A protein has these predicted regions:
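Polybasic, glycine- and aromatic-enriched phosphate-binding surface used to engage nucleic acids
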Residues: 1-150
Length: 150
């Protein structure tokens, strides 16, 4: 499909000095920003040290983010398409699906649509429940084990 997976690179509590409430900075996407209906919703956190924005260079490339899980709670399979988004970086509790080959916008949209349709397939949730149980979904598992139903 011309896609690969990597884990978000920002560990927010190791970058506290770069966090800011200033919306003119880069958006830091957390797994808690992914809603149950698989959209992104920015938020104000209860923990004052945790902020939605960060003073770092970001990307505007389209990706799909997938919840990795926290290790201390029941795993919930959630994902969201990130496109037409302000510059962003991704926190380490999310995996990112991104293109590894050059694709025009039309082709990339088609490929991402196939992935999302597969994620919406009831077989995907059934597979996750059987194979992963309450454990999180690693980069390697997402890339090599989770089936994409086309």
């Amino acid at each position: 499909m011309g896609l690969s997976v990597k884990t978000g690179t920002v560990v927010w509590n190791e970058r506290k000095e770069l966090l800011t409430p200033d919306e003119t900075n880069t958006t830091l996407l957390y797994n808690t920003n992914v809603t149950n209906d698989n959209k992104i919703k920015l938020t104000k956190f209860k923990n004052d040290e945790k902020q939605q924005y960060i003073n770092m260079e970001g990307s505007t490339d389209p990706i799909i983010v997938v919840n990795r899980g926290n290790g201390n709670a029941k795993y919930t399979f959630k994902y969201a398409l990130i496109e037409k988004f302000a510059p962003y970086v991704v926190e380490n509790h999310l995996n990112m699906i991104y293109p590894t080959t050059s694709m025009d916008k039309k082709k990339l949209t088609k490929v991402f649509k196939q992935v999302i349709q597969s994620f919406e397939n009831p077989k995907t949730r059934e597979f996750i429940a059987l194979f992963f149980g309450n454990n999180g979904l690693s980069k390697t598992e997402l890339e090599t084990i989770l089936p994409i139903y086309v």
